[in-house]
From Swiss-Prot:
<dbReference type="GO" id="GO:0042585">
    <property type="term" value="C:germinal vesicle"/>
</dbReference>
<dbReference type="GO" id="GO:0044727">
    <property type="term" value="P:epigenetic programing of male pronucleus"/>
</dbReference>
<dbReference type="GO" id="GO:0001940">
    <property type="term" value="C:male pronucleus"/>
</dbReference>
<dbReference type="InterPro" id="IPR010736">
    <property type="entry name" value="SHIPPO-rpt"/>
</dbReference>
<dbReference type="GO" id="GO:0072529">
    <property type="term" value="P:pyrimidine-containing compound catabolic process"/>
</dbReference>
<keyword id="KW-0963">Cytoplasm</keyword>
<dbReference type="Pfam" id="PF07004">
    <property type="entry name" value="SHIPPO-rpt"/>
</dbReference>
<keyword id="KW-0217">Developmental protein</keyword>
<dbReference type="GO" id="GO:0001673">
    <property type="term" value="C:male germ cell nucleus"/>
</dbReference>
<dbReference type="GO" id="GO:0005737">
    <property type="term" value="C:cytoplasm"/>
</dbReference>
<dbReference type="GO" id="GO:0003682">
    <property type="term" value="F:chromatin binding"/>
</dbReference>
<comment type="function">
    <text>Maternal factor that plays a role in epigenetic chromatin reprogramming during early development of the zygote. Involved in the regulation of gametic DNA demethylation by inducing the conversion of the modified genomic base 5-methylcytosine (5mC) into 5-hydroxymethylcytosine (5hmC).</text>
</comment>
<dbReference type="GO" id="GO:0001939">
    <property type="term" value="C:female pronucleus"/>
</dbReference>
<dbReference type="GO" id="GO:0042393">
    <property type="term" value="F:histone binding"/>
</dbReference>
<keyword id="KW-0156">Chromatin regulator</keyword>
<keyword id="KW-0539">Nucleus</keyword>
<comment type="subunit">
    <text>Interacts with histone H3. Interacts with histone H4.</text>
</comment>
């Protein structure tokens, strides 16, 4: 129930203390609204729509079944719901049908071969030239023209062609012995030489007069060393120093 709005006009009395006179001033009227109107704005947006769960939404499986086009998922243009070959409740080995699939040779024998190595005969040379087909002449009333291609005896039974293919001018026999009646002379091969063509002997025994190890006896060192120096050289290897300061 709506409550009526109450409009009140407030007045204020103001006294002028200085002059001792009083006067009345009127303010603007204020309109008050009820709490029902302030909080009921959302009721206007409500519409008469069904609540969730009052209608059924179709799933993607139900929508796929409504498609009039049959789904083809194999090579035989059959749908996914392919009926089984054998309807059985308990699939055991004895329920399988006994059959023998046809061999591929049997399938090939049923196919008709449409190929052959024999070709159509060549058209007659007389039909290759332009002539009047309306002429009806009896034999002896015309002169037969020579064939455009000379004919030769056919030597092959496979290719029924009498056209000369390879001229004999390229296969004229030459004078001389045949294959196997002569010896082939090979040219002499030269040995491998150096690129510098040097004739200096490389790996020859060197003629040196220096005797080898063991071919001579060592001489006693001169001047003779004192026993103290000789002992120091044996103990400290002083005689094998690179400087050889003891031998100088």
């Amino acid at each position: 129930m709506d409550q009526p709005a109450v409009a009140t006009a407030s007045t204020s009395i103001r006294e002028d203390l200085v002059g001792g006179e009083s006067f009345i001033t009127a303010s603007k009227p204020a309109q008050k609204t009820s709490s029902f109107e302030r909080e009921g704005w959302w009721r206007i947006a409500l519409t008469d729509t069904p609540i969730p769960g009052t209608y059924h939404l179709k799933t993607f499986i139900e929508e796929s079944l409504l498609n009039p086009v049959i789904a083809t998922y194999n090579f035989k243009n059959e749908g996914r719901k392919k009926p089984p070959l054998v309807q059985r409740n308990n699939p055991v080995l004895n329920d399988l049908p006994q059959y023998m699939p046809p061999d591929f040779l049997d399938l090939l024998k049923k196919q008709v071969a449409t190929y052959s190595f024999k070709d159509k005969p060549r058209p007659s040379p007389s039909t290759l030239v332009d002539k009047d087909q309306s002429l009806q002449l009896s034999p002896g009333q015309y002169n037969v023209l020579p064939a455009p291609v000379p004919k030769y005896a056919s030597r092959s039974c496979v290719f029924r062609s009498t056209v000369q293919r390879f001229p004999t001018t390229y296969f004229i026999p030459h004078e001389g012995p045949g294959p196997g009646h002569y010896n082939v002379k090979m040219p002499p091969t030269s040995s491998v030489t150096s690129c510098f063509q040097s004739r200096v002997p490389r790996f020859l025994p060197s003629c040196s007069k220096t005797p080898g190890p063991g071919a001579y006896t060592t001489l006693r060192q001169f001047p003779k060393q004192s026993p103290t120096i000789a002992k120091m050289g044996q103990e400290h290897s002083l005689f094998f120093n690179n400087n050889n300061w003891l031998l100088k």
